[in-house]
A protein has these predicted regions:
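Intrinsically disordered, low-complexity terminal regions
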Residues: 1-254
Length: 254
């Protein structure tokens, strides 16, 4: 190997070493910039979780413990967070706790609650996920963009709403229950048992894209030039209302 080759090889090795050091410190900075909050609260079986986020993903999972576990991962600039335990309700309100602050990083939550909890969560932007909950209420609201995924839900009252994004519900329909799903643009998919009893109003005014699947019985009819479906399955004890302005609505047999 001549002198020029050795020089070129040395320069390449030095460049690789410098890039490795830069990557290491950049990764360390990113990790250190993320702040974590973790706390566990004692809870009754019928506890209520009320969470208002600004931006970020919220995941709520039911578990077989009489306590609520809250883990929050805060990106820089870290948000202020002051959870409260008020008469059987755990309240977390990042909008209130950060009033007057122009810049606040995303906050991603992983929360575990008793199976029989009521869950009321909302965010301005980000995904909302709830699974394995069978309390009186499950409410998920996104004021701008994000997907809502509700899995293995057995609540009597369910409300899911966003502007842009998909909504997926997988669960049972309770007698006398109320279920409302609303989106402006995205896909709404409802996966429910075939023997569910409910009155239905489903509206897709722009796309007319409503698929009833196995639920397209004689008790259902399309009206308003296909923009709406009204009807009843079984004894109609529950109520399901679905509105999707510029997206699809689909029913799937569970």
């Amino acid at each position: 190997m001549n002198w020029n080759s050795r020089k070129t090889s040395a320069v390449k090795k030095a460049a690789i070493l410098i890039l490795s050091v830069v990557f290491f410190f950049a990764s360390s900075t990113a990790i250190s910039a993320q702040k974590k909050f973790a706390k566990t609260y004692p809870a009754s079986k019928n506890v209520r979780l009320q969470l208002t986020n600004r931006t970020g993903t919220v995941t709520v999972e039911g578990w077989d413990k009489s306590e609520i576990s809250v883990a929050a991962y805060m990106e820089a600039p870290a948000a202020n967070m002051e959870p409260q335990s008020l008469s059987g309700t755990i309240v977390i309100n990042l909008v209130k706790d950060n009033q007057g602050r122009n810049e606040v990083g995303n906050v991603n939550f992983l929360i575990k609650v008793p199976y029989s909890s009521s869950v009321d969560i909302e965010t301005r932007m980000g995904n909302l996920n709830v699974s394995n909950v069978r309390g009186g209420l499950v409410r998920a609201h996104i004021s701008s963009e994000g997907d809502i995924t509700l899995t293995n839900i057995a609540a009597e009252n369910v409300a899911a709403e966003n502007l842009i994004g998909d909504i997926f519900f997988d669960g049972t329909i309770s007698e006398s229950g109320n279920y409302r799903f609303t989106s402006t643009r995205g896909n709404i998919n409802l996966r429910i048992p075939f023997d569910s009893s409910f009155k239905l109003i489903a509206t897709a005014p722009s796309t007319r894209n409503i698929s009833l699947g196995d639920f397209g019985s004689a008790g259902m009819r399309f009206v308003s030039d296909g923009r709406r479906v009204v009807g009843q399955a079984g004894d109609g004890s529950a109520t399901i209302a679905v509105t999707n302005q510029r997206g699809s609505i689909s029913f799937i047999r569970r």
